[in-house]
Structures are given as structure tokens and as C-alpha cells.
């Protein structure tokens, strides 16, 4: 209690013995629930909701801690297609394969090739993912949201990073983020289509988008050579 021994807060009633008795009863009456609770405790599962606009602040207490992280509301990653992804923890090659499957490709933004009004976004293969850095990921098969479980990762809840190349920015998101409606934001959609965002919108966390200056001549963006 506050104030030390012998200085209990006025009006405070100690229910600790009653609570202990209830816990003991429930443990004996429902042993399977007790086992499940202990399993969850040992896993230290953190359900990271990418729809939250304050995800970084909400999970600040877990910053620097090792947890099993489930991405909630991230939606599936599509097999055979590029998916923009940004995570609040590092992944080595083994961890990438464990979640996204054998044959998965991961690439980092490296440059732009301009051909008049058509801009080609170029990427370089990588074997590890760093926290807060945006990447594109192509699994062989669909990866369901329920499979986005990352075991024993160390959370680093700094702001997502911006990778700038040749006047273009690849911007990661770790929480729900507003996108400008001025035509400078481009989002990677299904079938590797990069679409210009012309209306105000919000992009969920653990994704990424591109910013092309309004002064550029870009009328279309595409993912460059995959080799």
C-alpha cells in the first residue's frame, strides 16, 4: 500500500486472501484453463493491431522486450505478388522463411529508372529485414493473417524509416497513417500495380507507400526488373 507498512490508504480493503482463494478454486476446477493461461504467459504474446493510430505509444511498455508478435488486421500477403511490408522488429533469413515460406523473396528499395512519364522502381534482394525499414515481399503462396506470427522477436518501437532514392521516398508505416491527397503518394496494390492516391486516405500499419514529388513528370510507377 502507499505510504509503507501501517499506513494503509483510507477506505482500502485488503481482498488479497479472497482473490487467492478464487484463483486456487479456478485452478483446481478448470486445470485446462490454468494450463492455457500459463502457455500464453510463457509465449508473451503481443497482438499488434495495425489499425491503431497510436500503436507505437500503445505498446511502448514492450519496447526492447522479446515477444511473440501477432499482426492483427494486417490482412493476407498475396502469393506470387509483391507486398509492401514494414515491421517493428528485425528478422533474419531463417525467421523470414519460417513465416513467409520457402522461396520467399524480400527486396529493399534501391533506385528509380525514368522513361519519360513512366518511372520504374528498382529493388535489391536482401536476406534480413531491419526494424522500421520498408521492404517488398513476395511469398510463393498466400500467407494468411493468422500465420503472421513472429516468435521471439525484439520490439523496437521507433518511428518507421524513410528510404530516399533518386528523389523518391519509400515510407514505412508502423501504425495507421494519413496519406496526402495531393497526388504525391503512391500505394502498391494487387497484381503489382502501383496506384497514385488522389483522395485523402489512411494506410494501416506494417505497410509502406511511395512519395513522388509533385514537380516530377511521373504519370505511372511500376516495379522494376525482378532479376
Where do the model's predicted regions map?
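Middle-to-C-terminal accessory/interaction subdomains
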Residues: 1-43
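Phosphate-backbone binding interfaces of nucleic-acid-interacting proteins
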Residues: 105
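A short linear-motif detector with a strong N-terminal bias
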Residues: 4-5, 11-13, 64, 114-116, ...
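Conserved SET/PR domain catalytic loop and adjacent active-site segment
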Residues: 112-115, 132
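Short linear interaction motifs
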Residues: 115-123
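A short, polar beta-strand/turn micro-motif
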Residues: 42-100, 122-193, 198-226
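C-terminal outer-membrane/trafficking sorting elements
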Residues: 110-113, 227
